[in-house]
């Protein structure tokens, strides 16, 4: 039997996932991290992007988080996200439109709030990376 750890992925609004997993991979501010059974305790900030979870049956599920924190305890991994979505619930067209809008705002610089536009651009790019990860998974 595979060694597992319990995982909870929650946003401010709701619990997105709860269950036993073999592996979790996320983008932290220090770089990508992979968490499995026996990992040392850890608390790190997350960048916007995909969170991949490998469940007991070998199935991989992908979520999008807009940032937040990852906490690793001996038997529990918790993702506390600002916003969390199942990747299947994301709208690719809306993410592309938001990315183009942010790029145009940065280029035009009229009444520009650069930090807001840059944050919107980073979040849209992260959403698109998450959707690309799903496509790649489906092509296997």
Curated annotation (Swiss-Prot):
MF GO annotations: ATP binding; proton-transporting ATP synthase activity, rotational mechanism
Subcellular location: Cell inner membrane
Pfam families: ATP-synt_DE, ATP-synt_DE_N
Main subcellular location: membrane
Organism domain of life: Bacteria
Protein family per UniProt: Belongs to the ATPase epsilon chain family.
Name used for this protein in its record: ATP synthase epsilon chain
